[in-house]
Curated annotation (Swiss-Prot):
The protein's Enzyme Commission number: 2.8.1.13
Protein name: tRNA-specific 2-thiouridylase MnmA
Organism: Staphylococcus haemolyticus (strain JCSC1435)
Superkingdom, natural source: Bacteria
Residue ranges of the region described as Interaction with tRNA: 149-151, 307-308
Interaction with target base in tRNA, as annotated region: 97-99
Family assignment from sequence similarity: Belongs to the MnmA/TRMU family.
Record GO terms (molecular function): ATP binding; tRNA binding; tRNA-uridine 2-sulfurtransferase activity
Positions that bind ATP: G11, M12, S13, G14, G15, V16, D17, S18, M37, G126
Reactions this protein catalyses: S-sulfanyl-L-cysteinyl-[protein] + uridine(34) in tRNA + AH2 + ATP = 2-thiouridine(34) in tRNA + L-cysteinyl-[protein] + A + AMP + diphosphate + H(+)
């Protein structure tokens, strides 16, 4: 089968990465369709939402490269599957990663299902990741060539079935080359800056945005010894290891968030970047997903990331229970945060990931959320 007989539906955001993705596929002779996903009702609140501007950029790019385009509305799916999860996690005192859930439920589920109805053989996105396809039909997900832009961390929940239908055309090149291609082709998005906001919601004042959906309750900031250091403006606004926004003056080392007490609405803080309370030895995680089978019963060694762009840490992964994993670190790790993803790697291969629930020292539970 030649490329012209293979239909690829591209998820286009109005950014330079998805624009170049569509161009590369078109240039390679594929039957390409561009789809813009509208997943957030920008009339819901007063934040600056760029959906209209982004769609106009999609139209301009699709016209430039000569492919058909459509807009599809997934607002209900996004609200039900991603945003309610996002809010529920904050209510629990955790720090969620909406991009992970957005990829799992929207970009590679709702969008993939829609694309298949359009006769797609594959979907493609502008993610910095790679797919390795084997002769027996199974696939592996690899880190993007541009290590600084690699996005496998956010794609860790994708299944073998999903990835078998996915292409990541720019995963083999770095960001500078993507910009260069966009400029050489004079694409409308060539000089557009990268978005850094919440998946599909955009860039806005996070504190103001969150307060529109969750009522904030101020409370005391205390040290682990019980000394009162001030007041916090709502536990949901703080994350483990946070330094800024605490409002604690005085001499000496900076202060950092080391824990939350949900029941008594207390934010725990301690002084010093390397305070012992910020370090842990192992974690328990749930909602785990692996691209290919792994030996959880006997356990296995690999490396892991606990946040995006973090250096890999050597770990040992084993089954804790039917629905949970225990991940033990080779050396103590700082500021691991419940609600975030732990993502596993075997060199360049992304094995999968899970959601961090509880974090422990060897001597007992670390009181990040109590």
């Amino acid at each position: 089968m030649s490329n012209k007989d293979i239909r690829v539906v591209v998820g286009m955001s109005g950014g330079v990465d998805s624009s170049v993705t569509a161009h590369v596929l078109k240039d390679q002779g594929y039957d390409v369709i561009g789809i813009f996903m509208k997943n957030w009702d920008d009339t819901d609140e007063n934040g600056v939402c760029t959906a209209t501007e982004d769609y106009n950029d999609v139209i301009a790019v699709c016209n430039q490269i000569g492919i058909p385009y459509y807009a599809v509305n997934f607002e209900q799916e996004y609200w039900d599957k991603v945003f309610t999860y996002f809010l529920d996690e904050y209510k629990k005192g955790r720090t969620p990663n909406p991009d992970v859930m957005c990829n799992k439920e929207i970009k590679f589920k709702a969008f993939l299902e829609h694309a298949l109805k359009l006769g797609a053989d594959y979907v493609a996105t502008g993610h910095y990741a790679r797919i390795r396809r084997h002769d027996d039909g199974h696939v592996e997900m690899l880190r993007g060539v541009d290590n600084n832009k690699d996005q496998t961390y956010f794609l860790n929940q994708l299944s073998q079935q999903q990835l078998s239908k996915v292409m990541f055309p720019i995963g083999d090149i770095d960001k500078k080359e993507v910009r260069k291609i966009a400029e050489e082709q004079d694409l409308a998005t060539a000089k557009k800056k990268d978005s850094t906001g919440i998946c599909f919601i955009g860039e806005r004042n996070f504190k103001t945005f969150l307060s529109q959906y969750l009522p904030a309750q101020s409370g005391e900031m205390r040290t682990l010894n019980g000394d009162k250091m001030g007041m916090h403006s709502g536990l949901m606004y703080y994350t483990i290891g946070q330094r800024h926004g605490l409002g604690i003056g005085g001499d000496g080392d900076p202060w950092f968030v080391v824990g939350k007490n949900l029941e008594d609405n207390i934010l725990y803080v301690e002084q010093g970047f390397h305070h012992d309370a910020l370090y842990s030895d192992y974690l328990i995680a749930s909602d785990f997903s692996f691209v290919n089978p792994v030996d959880l019963d006997n356990g296995f060694e690999c490396t892991a990331k606990f946040r995006y762009r973090q250096k890999d840490t050597k770990v040992f992964v084993q089954r804790e229970s039917q629905n949970a994993l225990r991940v033990t670190f080779d050396e103590p790790v700082r500021a691991i945060t419940p609600g975030q993803a732990v993502v596993f790697y075997d060199e360049e291969v992304c094995l999968g990931g899970a959601t961090i629930d509880d974090v422990f020292k060897t001597t007992g539970q670390l009181s990040y959320v109590v």
